[in-house]
Amino acid sequence: MIARILAALADSMEMPVAAGGGSVLGTIKIAVMPIAKVFTMCFLGLLMASKYVNILPPSGRKLLNGLVFSLLLPCLIFSQLGQAVTLQKMLQWWFIPVNVVLGTISGSIIGFIVASIVRPPYPYFKFTIIQIGVGNIGNVPLVLLAALCRDTSNPFGDSEKCSIDGTAYISFGQWVGAIILYTYVYQMFAPPPEGFDAEEENLALKTLPVDAAPEQVPLLTQNFPKDFSPTQDLLPVQSTEPRGRGVSRKGKIAQIFVFLYEKLKLKQIVQPAIVASILAMILGAIPFTKKLIFTNGAPLFFFTDSCMILGDAMIPCILLALGGNLINGPGSSKLGFKTTAAIIIGRLVLVPPVGLGIVTVADKLGFLPADDKMFRFVLLLQHTMPTSVLSGAVANLRGCGRESAAVLFWVHIFAIFSMAGWMVLYINILF
């Protein structure tokens, strides 16, 4: 009996899939293995943070998060994107940032519909829209692609080319995600006049959600004196001292630039990963600097090689930190079971099919590079990811960090299963 079952399983592995030429179980293996690797490393991080081992206490996880987002992730993006990008490729990749914007718009519309049906507790209507509408287009896709490309049997061919192309595509869209996060999301998380929680108003800038990246908060919150006004010293000040017309004009121009810098929140947008992406695109698009920095044997290739070595450490470090952050559990939340479940279903079940439709239409219209399956796979992944982790830092700044932490916890738990299912579908469609 056991022999017959094993024989049947072996036969099923050889059965071709209708959408492609692979086997049923083979396709499932390709899609599930990266998720299994991610889950294993997160579990080890959870174990290291447990009270029985306690190698990753909260202070250690905070330092690890800071190291990842301030050094390791920018190094990975700079080395991989710089090697892959050219001016011609940047023109071919124009739909990647457009896809991020379309994904945010479509996700927000779905979030609005879900919130209108579920009616979350006041004042979490806009909060629910954002939790459904804005996905993680950075570190989680990078982790999944790294795990997928390491497998020599991956459907995208050569492991090194798979990794470089995938990282380049994902990194190319990150700068748009950062702008969306610190403009649209920041405004949508604006608290009501009475605040999300009157008792915690004074603590809103002092605590972090368990899944937030602590190193991001200094980019959002400044340690100003209590009597400091955000517009202080930004507008022209009338002085009794005589000054020339030229000095006055220069001073006003400088003050206008400073005012715009603060008003547009450029300090929040210009994060290390975004700076690395912009530098890689500029230096990689210019033939002279590309040959000088990113080509094997180039005079400055030692710098790129050093970034590659540091970048290789990003994946395990971020997964250990993410697993360690889960040790505290979801925490308390005022959203309730119905709203939390609606966010999970909206983000992981309703958003991906709409994203699949967007990518399919773009492909039919000829907006995507011909015969580049990795390009299409990355576009689909952008619609499949759980809620953005960095939105937790913005939510914390706005006073709803506790609710955001609870949502991030449950969404990432269920995303382990949903991402595997959607990846099976995508691989069958593409191959």
Curated annotation (Swiss-Prot):
Name of this protein: Protein PIN-LIKES 6
Side Cytoplasmic, residues: 51-66, 115-128, 191-268, 328-340, 398-406
Signals that turn on the gene: Up-regulated by auxin application.
Listed InterPro entries: Mem_transp_PIN-like, PILS2/6
Lineage, broadest ranks: Eukaryota, Viridiplantae, Streptophyta, Embryophyta, Tracheophyta
Stretches of the chain found on the membrane's Lumenal side: 1-29, 88-93, 150-169, 290-306, 362-376, 428-431
Segments crossing the lipid bilayer: 30-50, 67-87, 94-114, 129-149, 170-190, 269-289, 307-327, 341-361, 377-397, 407-427
Family of the protein in this entry: Belongs to the auxin efflux carrier (TC 2.A.69.2) family.
Pfam families in alphabetical order: Mem_trans
Subcellular compartments: Endoplasmic reticulum membrane
Assigned GO CC terms: endoplasmic reticulum membrane
Membrane protein topology class: Multi-pass membrane protein
Tissue specificity statement from the Swiss-Prot or TrEMBL entry: Expressed in seedlings, rosette and cauline leaves, stems and flowers.
